[in-house]
Amino acid sequence: VIARSGVSPANERTLVLLSTTKGNIGLLNGDPAKCDLNDTAEVVGRHFGAANRPLVISNACISGVSAIVVASRLIRSGEYDHVFVAGFDLLCDFIVSGFNAFKSVSPALCRPYDAARDGLTLGEAGGAVLLTTDRELSATGITVAGGGISNDANHISAPSRTGDGLAFAIGAALREASLGAAAIGMVNP
């Protein structure tokens, strides 16, 4: 993304923002110091010659979306013109055993839109996007109109059964985007 965009992290108006659910938590058994996400961000920042100290967003399953919301707000505030958002997650025994304890891992291939779906398939991934004020650099032309983040502090692994936290986040996103509920064309469950 950096090479394709031509935007340099060394630019004072550019930020690098990292997003991860847990980081490289598998290193806790070896060298715990290598698990510090701020240290990881510093290494990435040095590698790309970043002018600004990279930020880290680590909010469990909503880390990626949270990072996009934070990046869009930083751009909208005028603090930055460009924000590279890079997300990554790695598999390790801790992660696999956690999802197994929730009985959420499918014994078969993942079928997310199938009525007979029976869980998820874990994997490792990394990806990056550039949020920018420069429309010519935008690969998609997509604008983040608004975002909402909430924490209903209900249960370690389950949202509130009332949906209060979700309703708050949706309401906040709509308010930030200056949209009403009628503007929602699709909900992805």
In which residue ranges do the predicted regions lie?
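Conserved catalytic cysteine-centered active-site region
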Residues: 23-70, 74, 79, 95-122
